[in-house]
Amino acid sequence: MEKKAKKKEQRYLMFLLSILLSSCSIIGLTNDFGKLTPTEKNKIISLKKFEKLSQDTIYKINASQLKQELLKYESAMVYEFTNGCSSEYCRPLQVYENYAQKHHYKLFLVMNGFGNLDKTKSQTVTSPLFAIDGDYYKKCFRSVYTRYFDNELRDKPLKDKDWLGGIFIFEHGKYVKTLQDLPKE
């Protein structure tokens, strides 16, 4: 009789646990596109070309497209970031815009997913917003397609696992260095 009661209790606990877990929402495992509202989804499109970019749109991009565009600029800075990041290395986007302007960099702001999109959209920036196109890399996990994007930017094998930072500096389209944080001034 005791075994039957214990089994029933275990089933009940499993049932409660499954209800609890089904109501959880994990942000950042994938690109989180499915968690966006229909209105937000409509404002995200694949980049066709770098002309007439709207402040109201987020453009999905891959590193190959970006590298082609980087060739047009003497100096460029790519900041690949996570929306709503609270790390010591994450600053408001305006800080990156100010730094790029002061140092004559063309700035490209590239999100690595769509979770916490409201935290980015609530900031005032003049630069267009881009997002890594995970579908291009045929990977659904954010950590994987972000690594592939970063490595392709640096002309490294896609599967290399060394993370050096999210700020990429280019001169005449050639990768120069990666930074974790903006230099102190």
Q: Can you describe what each PLM-predicted range is?
A:
Residues L13-S23:
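Bacterial N-terminal signal peptides
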Residues W163-T178:
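A short, hydrophobic beta-strand/beta-hairpin element that forms part of a small beta-sheet core
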Residues Q68-S86:
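Short active-site neighborhood of thiol/selenol oxidoreductases, capturing the structured segment around
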Residues Q123-W163:
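Short, internal strand/loop/helix patches
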Residues G34-S54:
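Post-signal peptide N-terminal segment of mature Sec-exported envelope proteins
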Residues Y89-F130:
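Structural microenvironment flanking redox-active thiols in thiol-disulfide oxidoreductases
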